[in-house]
Regions:
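Catalytic glycan-binding domains that act on GlcNAc-containing polysaccharides
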Residues: 6-126
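Sec-dependent N-terminal signal peptides
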Residues: 1-5
Length: 126
């Protein structure tokens, strides 16, 4: 069984839908362009190599054989799967605010440094 699919199924079963958050972030990060590149950040969600490695570490620790490649960042569906994996592990209570700040500032984000990004994403969601 694929871990990412299990996570997505679990999120839907719990009634939580990351789609509005992901769609707002996608508009800010890449305007929906799966080929968008900004330094080491690429794809619709502007995923870094560090984030791919973190997803693979989470998958490995869960016993899954699934792994993501750097090229997967250019695939919108796989990018969204990686978003869900990161949130399921680092944001298990599904806090939208934490999800946005985590995406902007990384796993050890600074709250004050992520507030402008948080406001941008929240405006797009409303």
């Amino acid at each position: 069984m694929i871990f990412a699919s299990t996570l997505e199924a679990s999120a839907k079963k719990d009634g939580f839908d990351w789609e509005p958050v992901m769609n707002a972030i996608i508009q800010i990060e890449s305007k929906g362009n799966p080929m968008a590149v900004n330094g080491s950040y690429v794809g619709v969600l502007q995923i870094s190599p560090v984030l791919v490695k973190e997803c693979n570490n989470i998958l490995k620790s869960s016993g899954s054989n699934k792994r993501y490649s750097l090229a997967d960042r250019f695939n919108a569906t796989k990018s969204k799967e990686m978003f869900v994996i990161i949130q399921s592990f680092h944001n298990p209570l599904n806090s939208v605010e934490k999800a946005i700040c985590l995406w902007s500032g990384g796993i050890r984000y600074n709250v004050s440094k992520t507030q402008a990004y948080l406001r941008k994403v929240m405006r797009l969601m409303n």
